[in-house]
Curated annotation (Swiss-Prot):
An accessory protein needed during the final step in the assembly of 30S ribosomal subunit, possibly for assembly of the head region. Essential for efficient processing of 16S rRNA. May be needed both before and after RbfA during the maturation of 16S rRNA. It has affinity for free ribosomal 30S subunits but not for 70S ribosomes. Residues 1-21 are annotated as: Disordered. It holds the Pfam family RimM. This is Ribosome maturation factor RimM. Residues 148-229 form the PRC barrel domain. Keywords: Chaperone, Cytoplasm, Ribosome biogenesis, rRNA processing.
Length: 229
């Protein structure tokens, strides 16, 4: 399986997306922008919308866009790899500092290598600027569906990794994009040269030659990989 954010062990082609590759977010405020928490006037809050258990951070507001309350976002993955979640989801949860808010998004679209969107109730540039720096979360359940043999990185992290002989190799701690394919960063308990316990690490390419099965229901990934590699 290859790609920024999801994998496809069977086909070896670049898949859709998964956990999100973060892009740097400019934190310095623009002139006239607010440094405070999310302005309650910038979005309409539904008190019944509590923070979802399956919230996944997918981007951040980096600036206002235009004069009519639109915001510009840096997605943690590009279109077709994770930015799609920003485009599809209409319910967003925003976090700026310690304050969390819910926003219903009326429109979202691609704009160059960014996403621009209009949160309901953001009526002008000032209210949009007040959202600058807010982290954007959506429900995992609102992600676009993938093919049966494609996987979101966020669903792979935490799975056990075993080889075909049943030897435990550790747990997926992270997924890495090397520009060609995805790599599983697998952590396991080990012992250092000084005899003290430490965390060992294995880097296993997420491609079909090594990944033999992804068994999400069983919570594991089966690989063709030896413990002494």
């Amino acid at each position: 399986m290859a790609g920024h954010d999801s994998g496809n062990a069977k086909r070896g082609r670049s898949p859709s997306f998964g956990v999100f590759v973060r892009k740097p977010v400019e934190r310095a405020p623009a002139k006239g922008a607010s440094d405070g928490a999310v302005d309650s006037q910038a979005i309409r809050i539904d008190a019944a919308q509590s923070w979802p258990d399956d919230a996944v951070e997918v981007g951040a507001v980096v600036d206002a866009y235009g004069l009519k309350g639109w915001v510009k976002l840096a997605a943690h993955a590009g279109a077709g790899r994770g930015g799609d979640a920003l485009l599809k989801a209409r319910d967003w949860w925003l976090q700026k500092g310690a304050e969390r808010k819910f926003a219903r998004v009326t429109q979202a679209k691609l704009h160059g290598d960014t996403v621009v969107a209009h949160p309901d109730g953001s009526v002008d540039r000032d209210t949009a600027l007040a959202l600058r720096g807010a982290r954007v979360f959506v429900r995992r359940g609102d992600f676009p569906a993938l093919a049966a043999d494609e996987f979101y990185w966020v669903d792979l992290i935490g799975l056990d990794v075993v080889n075909e002989a049943g030897v435990a190799l550790g747990k997926i701690a992270d997924m890495i994009d090397n520009g060609v394919h995805s790599i599983m960063r697998v952590e396991y308990p080990a012992t250092g040269k000084d005899g003290r316990p430490k965390t060992g690490e294995r880097l296993i390419p997420f491609v079909g030659v090594y990944v033999k099965a992804v068994e999400q229901a069983a919570g594991r990934v089966v690989v063709d990989w030896e413990a002494d590699y």
